[in-house]
Amino acid sequence: MEKEILLLLLVIMFLTVADVDAVRVPFCATKSAKDSIFGLRDQTCSVSGVESDERPRFVAVTEGDERWLQIALDMIHKNKCDYVALLFYASWCPFSRSFRPSFDVISSLYSSIPHFAIKESSIKPSTLSKYGVHGFPTLLLLNSTMRARYRGTRMLDSLVAFYSDVTGIETLDKTSLERSVSVPHLGNENNTEPENCPFTWARSPENMLRQETYLALAIVFVLLRLLHLIYPTLVVFMKFTWRRIAQNMRLESLLEHTVGFLSRAVQLCMHRRSNLQGGAMNARAWASKSLATVSIGDSSSSNRRSSSSQ
C-alpha cells in the first residue's frame, strides 16, 4: 500500500513539472532606450531556446559622425553584423553629390549590411588618414578581419559587382535590380577612372587650423625648429652674398670711373690736336704774309737805284 502511494506521488510530481514546461511562454527581451533610438539591436530573439539565423535588416543610410563611426566598429567587433559599409563624402564635392543616390540604392539592395554616410565636416582629418581616405567620395566595406575600398565608377552595376565580390552576398534578381530606383549618372560612363575631390584643409589652411589645431601647432613647431637649426648657415650665406654684391658694386664703380677718365683723356687729346692744327695754319698764313712784304720791299729798292743812276 505504501509503495502504491509513493508511486502515485511520483507520477503526480512528474505531470506537474511537464505542465509547467508546457505552459512556459517564450518572450523577447525589451529594447532599451539606446537601442530604440539608435536602432542597432538585433531584430531577432531566441524562442524556446532556438536562436533564429535571420540577420537584422537595415533599410536606410545612417548619417553620422565620429561617434557613429565608433558604433559601426562596435557592431563589427560584437558580431552584430558581418559587414559594415562606410561612405566618406563632402557636401561641396560634386562627385559626392552624384554618388550618393547610388549609395542609397545599394543600401536597399543589401539591407543586411548597415550603411553609414560620414560627412567630411563632422570628422577629423586624422581619422580620415587613419582609414586611408585621401579624397571624396570614398566607400569602404569592413568586417572583423579586412577592409575593402571601392575604386570603380558611380554606376550601380559596378557597385553590385563590388559588393558581391567582397561579401559573397547575392543581391536581388536581375528583374528586381532593373525595377529598382533609377540612379542618375553624371559625366562620361565609359570613364573608369575613380573621381574624387581633395580635402578642404588641403585647399584652405584655415580649415586645418580650425579642425586640427594640435597638428597645425606641431607643424609650426617643426618649421621653427628647422629654422633655428639652419639659421647660422643662413647668416653665413647672407654675409657671403653681401660681400659678393659689394665687391661687384666696387668693380662696377671702378670701371665706370676708368671709362670716364679715358673719355676725358680722349677729349683732351682731340682738343690739343685741333689747337696744333690751328696754330700750324696760322703760322703758314703769317709766313706767306712775311714773304709778300719782303718781295714788295725788294722791288721798290731796285727801282730807286735805277732812277738814281740815270
Swiss-Prot record:
The keyword Transferase does not apply. It holds the Pfam family Thioredoxin. This is 5'-adenylylsulfate reductase-like 4. PROSITE patterns: THIOREDOXIN_2. It is a single-pass membrane protein. Keywords: Glycoprotein, Membrane, Signal, Transmembrane, Transmembrane helix. The gene is APRL4. Glycans are attached at residues 143, 190. Residues 1-22 form the signal peptide. The chain crosses the membrane at residues 217-237. Residues 49-168 form the Thioredoxin domain. One of its GO terms (cellular component) is membrane. It is found in: Membrane.
